Amino acid sequence: NNTKQIEAIVIACVNTHIEYLKNLVKDYNIFKVKSIIAGGRTGQESIIKALEEAKKISESNKDIVLIHDGVRPIIDSKLIIDNIECVEKYGTSITCLKQRETTIISKSHENV
């Protein structure tokens, strides 16, 4: 909401959380959220649904679309702007961050 280069936000989430999320958006005055939709069975399906929704509210087929997963919710305006500038220059962009989760490999294929 604080990044001036962002004009609209579409959120795909678990169907049972839509009303709760709408209330959060209202309570925190996140006015750039234009649509909250039910996501799909997978992350990929949720992305497709969000892109279809974004296309409905887009004013131009030349708009830049950024996709952000909710697993790493804390990003700053600089990262968003860097991605936009990269898309403007190269036509695409992807952000990679150092892994912070714990990765475990089970050689016995049993639960950890």
Regions found by a protein language model. Give the residues of each.
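Conserved N-terminal catalytic core of the sugar/cofactor nucleotidyltransferase
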Residues: 1-62
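Short beta-strand-to-loop acidic/aromatic patch adjacent to the donor-nucleotide binding site
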Residues: 59-71
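Active-site-adjacent loop/tail segments of enzyme domains
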Residues: 38-41, 70-79
